[in-house]
Each structure stands twice: as C-alpha cells, then as structure tokens.
Curated annotation (Swiss-Prot):
Keywords: Disulfide bond, G-protein coupled receptor impairing toxin, Secreted, Signal, Toxin. It comes from Bombina maxima. GO terms for biological process: endothelial cell proliferation. It holds the Pfam family Prokineticin. Residues 1-19 form the signal peptide. The lineage of its organism: Eukaryota, Metazoa, Chordata, Craniata, Vertebrata. It comes from the Eukaryota. GO terms for molecular function: toxin activity. It is found in: Secreted. Disulfide bonds join C26-C38, C32-C50, C37-C78, C60-C86, C80-C95. This is Prokineticin Bm8-e. Belongs to the AVIT (prokineticin) family. Potent agonist for both PKR1/PROKR1 and PKR2/PROKR2, and inducer of a potent and long-lasting hyperalgesia. Also potentiates capsaicin-induced TRPV1 current, when tested on DRG neurons. At subnanomolar concentrations, this protein both induces potent chemotaxis of macrophages and stimulates LPS-induced production of the pro-inflammatory cytokines IL-1 and IL-12. In vivo, potently stimulates the contraction of the guinea-pig gastrointestinal (GI) smooth muscle (nanomolar concentration). One of its GO terms (cellular component) is extracellular region.
Length: 96
C-alpha cells in the first residue's frame, strides 16, 4: 500500500509540474515510441517512464545520447532530439 501511495503522489507531482509528459511505464527504450526514451523517475531510479526527447532549450544529460539505449537509464532526462547537442549552458546542460 505504501508503494502504491508513493506512485500516486509521484504521478500527481509530475502531472502538475511544468512541461511534464508521461507516455507510459517502461524498463527500456525499446518499449517506448519514436521520439521518446525510457527515463528514470527523478524520485526513484526503480521507476521509469517513456519521456519525450529533449527540445531546444530543455535540460539534458551530457552522457545520455544514445537512443535506443539497450540498458536501463539512470538519468531522469532523455537525450536531445535529432540534430541537437547537449552543451553546458550556465549552470546546467541544455539541448541546442
């Protein structure tokens, strides 16, 4: 029951946060549709969701660039969309 309550809270937080799009629960990129990756939850690396690839100006992880990735992603951020890179911009990395 505790796990269920945590998942419900997690989904509510993500649903009401700016720009969050969740397309489904997954384990690996191959389970997600085109233009998405299977990213770890920011709250628990044991929970993963299909999340859209990063667009221009969105935060990214510099080491997360392969799609599909055959393993389990540890980052809560997907790589940037095709044609974009993930350079450092100020204090964080952003797709550009």
């Amino acid at each position: 029951m505790k796990c269920f309550a945590q998942i419900v809270v997690l989904l509510l937080v993500i649903a009401f946060s700016h720009g969050a799009v969740i397309t489904g629960v997954c384990d690996r990129d191959a389970q997600c549709g085109s233009g998405t990756c299977c990213a770890a939850s920011a709250f628990s690396r044991n929970i993963r969701f299909c999340v859209p690839l990063g667009n221009n100006g969105e935060e990214c992880h510099p080491a997360s660039h392969k799609v599909p990735y055959n393993g389990k992603r540890l980052s809560s951020l997907c790589p940037c969309n095709t044609g974009l890179t993930c350079p450092k911009s100020g204090e964080k990395f952003q797709c550009s």
